[in-house]
Amino acid sequence: VPRTNIVTGRAFNRISFYGARGAFLEQIQMFAGPTVIWRYDQFGNDPLEGSESFDLSLTARGGWRLSGHAEHDYTDIQNGDYAAYTVDRGAGQVPYAPLSSVEDGFLFSSTLTTPTWQTANASAKISRSRGVIFPEGSAGFETRLTGSLALRPTSSIRIAYSQTFSRIRRDRDGSEFA
């Protein structure tokens, strides 16, 4: 979803090491850096959200790749975004009060990717994260499994399949959000 009326600041650094041709470990890459997002009219003040991340990618002989990602996230939840929300606390409708922020969000993921062979390639990813559930202004945990398979049985036929399983649970009581 394109976002408007924001300013994004991002910096990163990459470090790469290369093994000898034919070595078991042919390449190691690391990326790290922060990302900060402000509302346009509040640029330079407290950010709306941001993260610090670290990525590590290992490429083995034959093109096999194992990647890992770690990230710390923080989000300032804007109460005005939930002004029309109400909840029934037993005595009628009252205004909904979202969390003010989620300061301790995180994301950890690992991906295994096969080489690109003449007729096929595949990948599998598992991730675990904690962050904002934006539709209700609360915090939650997500577990996600993703897989993809691409087949090229002939020079003119391509078949692609992908599947994602995602489970989001609310932080406050462990109930399922999605």
Where are the predicted features?
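Exposed, low-structure sequence patches enriched in small/polar residues
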Residues: V1-A178
